Amino acid sequence: MASSSNYNTYMQYLNPPPYADHGANQLIPADQLSNQHGITPNYVGDLNLDDQFKGNVCHAFTLEAIIDISAYNERTVKGVPAWLPLGIMSNFEYPLAHTVAALLTGSYTITQFTHNGQKFVRVNRLGTGIPAHPLRMLREGNQAFIQNMVIPRNFSTNQFTYNLTNLVLSVQKLPDDAWRPSKDKLIGNTMHPAVSIHPNLPPIVLPTVKKQAYRQHKNPNNGPLLAISGILHQLRVEKVPEKTSLFRISLPADMFSVKEGMMKKRGESSPVVYFQAPENFPLNGFNNRQVVLAYANPTLSAI
């Protein structure tokens, strides 16, 4: 469903439920986290620091955790995997080397809380935050994930105590055909059409539809969004080979404009949009997904 005024999905990503009384840019002290000790992550991935000097290079950042779960009146279940997507970012938004250094030198804990009847996993980074950083984890020091999205569903029925036993930072370089909004759009306040795939994942920002596609679904109020909605059934999702939890959408070249996007290969016939999602994300397209307006830069707040 398209809506030019519905920002709820995007705002849930920007502002997940609060942890106790701590707000934005207030990092949670270690002594308030059930006496847990922070753990420093290891590293895996496609890191080439020469890329930090190339503004149009994008990377996907993910924390992969191993946790021990202790349920009340039940024995501890050890070695439960957790998938914690931090987001996709280009060098236009923040230098790659600084981002990786800040993530690797941080100390992390993991807790659980309930908000409006929904169970969340909260990952907390102990240390100094970077207020303007595009990744929420570095910007505000903590990030909430809906529990049944990031850990196996059979562990989501009761209240648990978590003990973080291993943490890996995965940095994956996006292929050269990746489309991202251009630098002036990232640092400005332009909103883009986007597809919402989950209330606790950022919307997938899309290029602007071409004029002929817009005319086919013209509406004086929210024509661009209706134009996107009218062609969602033509979009197909593909799993990116040899990448973890990374997917792509090849957009029809005759319907989408790429002039405002970052494209390393000028010969590409159509824009390709990459996004993070759980490994079991369905590949049968985007029918019935909500179309919203979203900022490319997640440090901005919706009006």
From Swiss-Prot:
Domain of life assignment: Viruses
Biological process, per Gene Ontology: symbiont-mediated suppression of host innate immune response; symbiont-mediated suppression of host JAK-STAT cascade via inhibition of JAK1 activity; symbiont-mediated suppression of host type I interferon-mediated signaling pathway; viral budding via host ESCRT complex
Gene3D superfamilies hit by this protein: Matrix protein VP40, N-terminal domain (2.70.20.20)
Quaternary structure note: Exists as a dimer until it reorganizes at the plasma membrane into multimeric form. Interacts with host TSG101. Interacts (via PPXY motif) with SMURF2 (via WW domains); the interaction positively regulates virus budding.
Misc. remarks from the entry: Most abundant protein in the virion.
Protein family per UniProt: Belongs to the filoviridae matrix protein VP40 family.
Name of the protein: Matrix protein VP40
Species of the source: Lake Victoria marburgvirus (strain Ozolin-75)
Gene: VP40
